[in-house]
């Protein structure tokens, strides 16, 4: 009977806040092993969060923008649902692990950080309209031959929020991300070789001043590649590697950097690497080996 392998767990949590009173947080999880090597999971629930706009957005102080925060903001409230399917697929003498996920968060109440209406201030307010986040991810893991593993993943992000009466993409949020990593370990793990590529999609920038645009309306996709080689001894490990091998950097990460006290200064428009290629080397010493 397939239903014998279906597990469902539900819960309900009650909280009391001196500011917001009593609120309930329901949650349900399900897991179903449909057949051997094919597992389905799902979850749904409701969540609350007390906003602290200044503490959570203190990075905005690295700009000349004035922060406008009302005396009282509503407690954030969201419904989240998600599902995933994991399959173990025989391929040769090994198995490919394939996982597909989809998660959605729908905000009923949310604090909106508006950096679009004006370039000289950031305005915090309660949500008036729709706000949601959809995330789809697929991941593949496979050991091609003994010691050599490949991991590939792709994630699509659709994050939108009502800002000044318009449903728009959240600024400075990549529309997609990708990962490709390869790892090879020799016999007895005497040598370890790792190569990782991170793919970052483009996205929307906060609206620039229409009369004096100091940045683009979009940021472009970019790729970051890291590599490392490790030589292992009984207690010592020597390693060397490089970060950001392609040496990709933002052209002008800080707006108005020449005049930090000017009205155009803004160090919050960071969407990519601000440091170039880095070469490093080091060693590790293991005091206790529990293996």
Task: Identify the residue ranges that each predicted region occupies.
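Membrane-embedded beta-barrel scaffold of Gram-negative outer-membrane proteins
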Residues: 33, 39-41, 74-126, 132
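Outer-membrane beta-barrel translocator/channel fold
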Residues: 39-88, 202-206
